[in-house]
Every structure is written in structure tokens, then in C-alpha cells.
């Protein structure tokens, strides 16, 4: 085991000098004793002259030149398998929940090759989420990739928590949750939410929070992914939740300049597309098992053309766009039904009835959008009878797209609802065909199925 010494420390980036004949390979892990702590470094570049440039997987406070560094001669390895379920780990797979050792039987390196073409499999099966707007407008494929796009505070994390809860309870599969650069408070809430709904023993949690150095945030997504790959290779259907994929990009940006790379557009790292591709290509389904991934994507300044969300779009099967305008109307989940898309919304996959209903809902909402200007200037009275009907139905549809969440019961005070896909289609079809024209639009707000709306109307 070769040893070297630290020659330079700049923030999270540490240069280490080794003997010329024992230079560590790129992505190998190094260890340095920093006071009482053992700090892990990951090799990023070989600079020549026996010097390697590394990223610290923890705080580099207290490091000094001349400290001895050991080459572990393998990449960072993390525990995988059933022992990780119900536990909270950091980027190195060390437990941070004060519950003792993980007790794993196997450790895997976090850097792995993506599955080959022969191993890949595609599936047309739908994954029912119980959330009306998602199941109807942008259905998820089992083994597909979903992005939740939204600016700050429109509900990405709450939507994700609801998805995990619904899928864990209704489908009883394993999930891996990678918290990448998010708030520690959310991580804590998330753990307690999972414990309260009794699904914690089906979820592995890996956290690299906002307050941690960029090295942790850059690699924690790979740690979570490696755990998910193990479950997949055992022949399971596993869910991988990443909150937030933008922070993964951001951590790369933070270390990119320190690693001596020229910045590209908007100051992002020049390797943005490649880093995203390396991660996304591993999140895939094979003939053995499937990984369905749901990724929250923060949209800086609500600008979907920013290089980071724009790069993410290319990898996804379904995009759920959360809109600030819809949130400001008090409609939650604040999913924009005209902006959200899914490759699965195809009559050959979802069936003709589902397809026609979804497209019908979109056309009514689109027409309402066009009429809004006329209403604002001239008022409702100037519209034709036909348009008045469209507006009335559109407003009912808009309210019916809202739904009380289980994970938000504490805030809303109303019990959560899981709505089966057939009930969702029946409800929206009925509204479009005019079966519920006699009901007031308030009856459709924050209910589950259409039957609840009818009941609510009797009380109004």
C-alpha cells in the first residue's frame, strides 16, 4: 500500500504527491488521518511528477501540507443489499443514524460501468401512482425515468415523498432515496414520515446535505445508485429517488474550477453533459430487474432553458413540470397539465380511452387559456354559450386536478387520497361529457375520486 504526502490544499481540492512508480489511478480512494477523523479523498486527475489532484469526501478543515496519505488501491466502496434498508448513510456508506454498524455482507465500488446493450430491456408496463394529474397526463413507465421540474418552493420534495409513500404501500417494492444537497430538515422530516407510515424498512436512505463539502454532494448520487443496482441485479423492481439532481450538477460546478477546467455556458463545468450521462446511463432496467427513477430537478430562476435542467430533459421518459402560477391558485400538486409530457401517453400503451381523456382535458384547458385574455378585458358575458361551457368545465377540471396528499395531512388537515387510474379516467371523462355541469366548481377542489366531489356538492 503506497503512501504519499499532501502538497497543496485549496478548499475541497487536495493535491497529493506519491512516488513516481506508485501513482494511484483515477477514481481510487485515498485515506488521510486528520486529527481524530479519517478523511477519504478521491483521485480526479494525475498532474505528472507523481502528483495527483483529489476531491475531499468531507471537510478539509485542519489539513496541512506534509500529512501522510495512504492509497487504498480501490475506488470508494459502499455497503449494498438488504442490510442497508431502514438505515441512513453518508456518501461513504457509513451509518449516520446512531444505530450501530450496517452489518453488510457485501460492498460495491461506486464507479461501475453501465449495463451493455444486450442486457437492457424495455417495458411498456405502467406504474400507477395514485396521483390523478400524474396518472392521467404524464403516466410513469415501470423501469422508466421521471423528472419533477420546478423552481424553489413549488412542491418537488412533497410530491416525491407522496410518490414514495404510495408506491411503498401499494406496490410493496424496495426504494433507495438519495438526498443530494438538500435541506437537512427535509431529510429529517422524510425519515420520520417514512417511519410513521411504516415503510422505513423498505427504504435505504443516503444523504449528502447542503452543508456538506462539494465532494460529498458530487458522489452521493452514485452511492445511492450503487445500492439500487444491487437490488436490481437480485431480480427486483426497485425505485430510485434523487432529490435533487441539480445539486449534483452544482457540486460538479463548484469543484470544476478548482480542478483547473475552463467554465462553459453560465459558469457550468465543461463536462456537464458527460457527468450527467455517466449517472443517467447507469439508471436503467435490465433483463434481471428494473430501476424506476424519480428525480427532482431544481430549475434556477424558473428558467427551463438553463443548461442544467436542459441537459437533464434529454434523459427522461416523463417530465412533470410544477408551475408557480398553478401553485398561486392554491391548486396542489401544482403540476402543469399542458407542460408535462410522457412517452407512455400513447394509445398503444395506455389504451384509447385514457389517451382520448387526457388529450380532451388538455384541449379544454388550452381553450380556457386562450379565452382568459378575452375574459379579463370584456368579461364572461361577451363569450358565446359554447365558450361559457368550456370555461365552466375547464375550471372544474382545474380544481379536480388538485388532490389532498397523505404526507401533507399535517398542513392541510384533510386526509390523503389514493385514486385508482380507472376512477381518475371515469371522473375526467364525466366532467368533459357534461355529466357534472350542475355541480358547483368548489365541489371539485381537493377531493379524491369524482364520487367524493358529488358528496361534497350536497354539503355546499
From Swiss-Prot:
GO molecular function: ATP binding; ATP hydrolysis activity; proton-transporting ATP synthase activity, rotational mechanism
Cysteines joined through disulfide linkages: none
Pfam families in UniProt: ATP-synt_ab (PF00006), ATP-synt_ab_N (PF02874), ATP-synt_VA_C (PF22919)
SMART domains for this protein: AAA
Compartments it resides in: Cell inner membrane
One Gene Ontology CC term in the entry: plasma membrane
Top-level taxon: Bacteria
InterPro entries: AAA+_ATPase, ATP-synt_VA_C, ATP_synth_F1_bsu, ATPase_a/bsu_AS, ATPase_alpha/beta_chains, ATPase_F1/V1/A1_a/bsu_N, ATPase_F1/V1/A1_a/bsu_N_sf, ATPase_F1/V1/A1_a/bsu_nucl-bd
Function: Produces ATP from ADP in the presence of a proton gradient across the membrane. The catalytic sites are hosted primarily by the beta subunits.
UniProt xrefs under HAMAP family: ATP_synth_beta_bact
Name listed for the protein in its UniProt record: ATP synthase subunit beta
Source organism: Klebsiella pneumoniae (strain 342)
Gene name for this UniProt entry: atpD
Amino acid at each position: 500500500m503506497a503512501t504519499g504526502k499532501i502538497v497543496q490544499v485549496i478548499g475541497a481540492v487536495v493535491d497529493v504527491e506519491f512516488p513516481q512508480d506508485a501513482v494511484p489511478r483515477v477514481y481510487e480512494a485515498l485515506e488521510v488521518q486528520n486529527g481524530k477523523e479519517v478523511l477519504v479523498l478521491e483521485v480526479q486527475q494525475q498532474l505528472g511528477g507523481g502528483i495527483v489532484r483529489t476531491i475531499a469526501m468531507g471537510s478539509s478543515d485542519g489539513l496541512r501540507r506534509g500529512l501522510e496519505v495512504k492509497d487504498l488501491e480501490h475506488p470508494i466502496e459502499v455497503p449494498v443489499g438488504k442490510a442497508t434498508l431502514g438505515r441512513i448513510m453518508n456518501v461513504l456508506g457509513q451509518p449516520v443514524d446512531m444505530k450501530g454498524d450496517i452489518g453488510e455482507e457485501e460492498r460495491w465500488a461506486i464507479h461501475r460501468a453501465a449495463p451493455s446493450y444486450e442486457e437492457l430491456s424495455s417495458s411498456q408496463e405502467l406504474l400507477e401512482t395514485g396521483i390523478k394529474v400524474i396518472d392521467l397526463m404524464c403516466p410513469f413507465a415501470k423501469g422508466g425515468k421521471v423528472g419533477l421540474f420546478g423552481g424553489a418552493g413549488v412542491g418537488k420534495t412533497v410530491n416525491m415523498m407522496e410518490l414514495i409513500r404510495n408506491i411503498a404501500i401499494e406496490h410493496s417494492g424496495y426504494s433507495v432515496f438519495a438526498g443530494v444537497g438538500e435541506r437537512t430538515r427535509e431529510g429529517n422530516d422524510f425519515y420520520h414520515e417514512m417511519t410513521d407510515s411504516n415503510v422505513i424498512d423498505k427504504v435505504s436512505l443516503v444523504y449528502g446535505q447542503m452543508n456538506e463539502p462539494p465532494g460529498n454532494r458530487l458522489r452521493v448520487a452514485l452511492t445511492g445508485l450503487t445500492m439500487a443496482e444491487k437490488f436490481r441485479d437480485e431480480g427486483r423492481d426497485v425505485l430510485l429517488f434523487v432529490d435533487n439532481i441539480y445539486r449534483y450538477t452544482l457540486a460538479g460546478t463548484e469543484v470544476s474550477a478548482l480542478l483547473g477546467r475552463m467554465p462553459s455556458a453560465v459558469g457550468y463545468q465543461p463536462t456537464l453533459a458527460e457527468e450527467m450521462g455517466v449517472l443517467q446511463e447507469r439508471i436503467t432496467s435490465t433483463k434481471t430487474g428494473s430501476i424506476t427513477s424519480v428525480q427532482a430537478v431544481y430549475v434556477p430562476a424558473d428558467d427551463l432553458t438553463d443548461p442544467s435542467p436542459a441537459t437533464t430533459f434529454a434523459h427522461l421518459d416523463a417530465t412533470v413540470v410544477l408551475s408557480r402560477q398553478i401553485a398561486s391558485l392554491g391548486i396542489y400538486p401544482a403540476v402543469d397539465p399542458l407542460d408535462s409530457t410522457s412517452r407512455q401517453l400513447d394509445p398503444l400503451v395506455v389504451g384509447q380511452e385514457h389517451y382520448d381523456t387526457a388529450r380532451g382535458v388538455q384541449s379544454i384547458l388550452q381553450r380556457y387559456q386562450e379565452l382568459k385574455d378575452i375574459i379579463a378585458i370584456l368579461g364572461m358575458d361577451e363569450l358565446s354559450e359554447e365558450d361559457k361551457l368550456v370555461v365552466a368545465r375547464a375550471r372544474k377540471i382545474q380544481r379536480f386536478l388538485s388532490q389532498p396528499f397523505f404526507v401533507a395531512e399535517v398542513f392541510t388537515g384533510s386526509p390523503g387520497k389514493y385514486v385508482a387510474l380507472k376512477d381518475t379516467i371515469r371522473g375526467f371523462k364525466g366532467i368533459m361529457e357534461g355529466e357534472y355541469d350542475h355541480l358547483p366548481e368548489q365541489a371539485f377542489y381537493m377531493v379524491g375520486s369524482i364520487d367524493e366531489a358529488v358528496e361534497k356538492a350536497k354539503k355546499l
